[in-house]
Amino acid sequence: MSNDSSGSEWELYRYTPSKGAAIALTVLFIVTTLIYSLQVVWDARKASKPEVDNPFDTPVDKCESITAISLGENYKKLTVRSTFSAFIPLFFGCIMEIVGYIARAVSSSNTKEIAPYVIQAVLLLIAPALYAATIYMLFGRLLHVMRCESLMIVSSRFGTSFFVFGDVVSFCLQAAGGGLMATVNGRTTGSNLITAGLVIQIVFFGVFIINEFRFSYSVARVCPFYRHISKKWWFLNLTLMLSSILIMVRSIVRLVEFVEGYDGFIISHEYFIYVFDAVPMLLAAIVFIVGSFFGNIFTTITECQSLKP
């Protein structure tokens, strides 16, 4: 962290925080989270309904021959339950955004109170890591069901785990750093931890986005049944790519903020937290909601696993 001010001059905020903006974001995230949750539950319930020749939710012994011939003998069938669990991190990420902006609204009324400041600072920092976890897991399932695991930049056996591991490390570093930032003696260490966490997040996300483009470019060559399925997978991948780019932009701006330090331009202007943090994270959740109407992981898995030889 560069050019820290002396402890006597240090304040929690370098500006007067807007209570109205924090309340507005709280409401927007509540509405978005409710719609997102209902949408995921609805999609999962639709996929759970028994359908003719749909092995996505039928016993293995009834669909084994179809799956083996269409998807390969070593294919591990995906279930609605295991797929549904991939959405849980993003849900809690949205909850963190809600609680974070509630705490920010409270903090705006008392800018000397440390507790609400720490809550909003930490939760708004680490929430994107939970978004990323959902994106990583959904992408891994998409590659699996389309038999494109060979397109993973890292070993297909550890592909999803590799990205999630980086996400967890980033999450822990930012959480620890966010707590230390609230103290005069710990703010330099806290800033360094957050910077390290953001760098890790950006590096892993960068590799992941490259992997998404690689998949988009090579899927027609690798997927054995590419010409026999609709474009629902394409809309799902587009959803993941757009969300990833939004989070990447947000993380880059936050990284610059902490590299600049306490006396930097970004940290002293509140609109950055809304334009380059709140808006991208809100849009990322909205992209999931809108994208599900055109193609979601449940419809993609159902379609791929329903193929007949």
Swiss-Prot record:
The keyword Ribosomal protein does not apply. Its main location: membrane. The chain crosses the membrane at residues 22-42, 83-103, 119-139, 162-182, 193-213, 233-253, 278-298. It is a multi-pass membrane protein. Keywords: Membrane, Transmembrane, Transmembrane helix. It is found in: Membrane. GO terms for cellular component: membrane. Confers resistance to molasses (to a particular toxic element present in some molasses). Belongs to the lipid-translocating exporter (LTE) (TC 9.A.26.1) family. This is Protein RTM1. It comes from Saccharomyces cerevisiae (Baker's yeast). The gene is RTM1.
